[in-house]
Amino acid sequence: MGYDVSRFQGDVDEDLICPICSGVLEEPVQAPHCEHAFCNACITQWFSQQQTCPVDRSVVTVAHLRPVPRIMRNMLSKLQITCDNAVFGCTTIVRLDNLMSHLSDCEHNPKRPVTCEQGCGLEMPKDEVPNHNCIKHLRSVVQQQQIRIGELEKTAAESKHQLSEQKRDIQLLKAYMRAIRSANPNLQNLEETIEYNEILEWVNSLQPARVTRWGGMISTPDAVLQAVIKRSLVESGCPASIVNEIIENAHERNWPQGLATLETRQMNRRYYENYVAKRIPGKQAVVVMACENQHMGEDMVLEPGLVMIFAHGVEEI
């Protein structure tokens, strides 16, 4: 529906009047053949009854409608109109194209969002403030939270039960696999080959790395840092069969003899450049896999590999 003509300052050109509602055009559209203009809502409602132009009865449908010319839109935008909230005391007169932005900030707008200043902080339409009850609102919030907590507790209990069942199934599956392997040695060899190929595929997917500051090595990473590195290993595609073992080898207590203490590391530092290292994506850390470092002595590598974490100095080659 169009704007009430009485809200506008001065005379309004008759070309800007909707023939259906007799108001000033709101969201105007035009029938292209006869060039008659209508409010979008008015003509849409009209077409629900008949498919003709309301003015000259020529055949026209919703699909035929087009936006009105720019000159007409400019004429509409320049009209001066009173605020929708004039009945509530607003005396502002604005250009039609600024009406919506004014309404959103108009202090007389009964639907303007306001925040309760009595303590609950609820945002509500201004006209609902007189009937607002903080205690009632907060009670509703608490009840909703209790319902949500109950749902989360139920979900957590179900997840815990499912996890317990899955752990039991995994143990049964492991026992079954052990029985099969013991009965068929060839199957065990095949499984080991598949696992080795999976490890090689993952290692080859990582970027070669160079360590420029071996002195920045963190040989005793805490549990939090190890968890961060482990997450990156998993995200990089590290096979599940070795990820835990590799991350355990991120601490010097599990390192081979040649890396076990600061003294031995300093003695063997000249050999570090011979390592084939791969960068753990996004981290100042490398993985040194035994399958790529068979040229190193047994006192410098671990099966299946080890992780070295640094404060800085890890670069991709």
UniProtKB/Swiss-Prot annotation:
User: One GO molecular-function annotation for this sequence?
Assistant: zinc ion binding
UniProt xrefs under InterPro entries:
NRDP1, NRDP1_C, Znf_RING, Znf_RING/FYVE/PHD, Znf_RING_CS
Entry keyword Heme:
no
- Transmembrane stretches in the record are none
**Sorted alphabetically, which SMART domains does this protein's record hold?**
RING
Residues annotated as coiled-coil are 135-175
Instruction: Return the EC number.
Output: 2.3.2.27
UniProt name for this protein: E3 ubiquitin-protein ligase NRDP1
From what organism does this protein derive?
Answer: Xenopus laevis
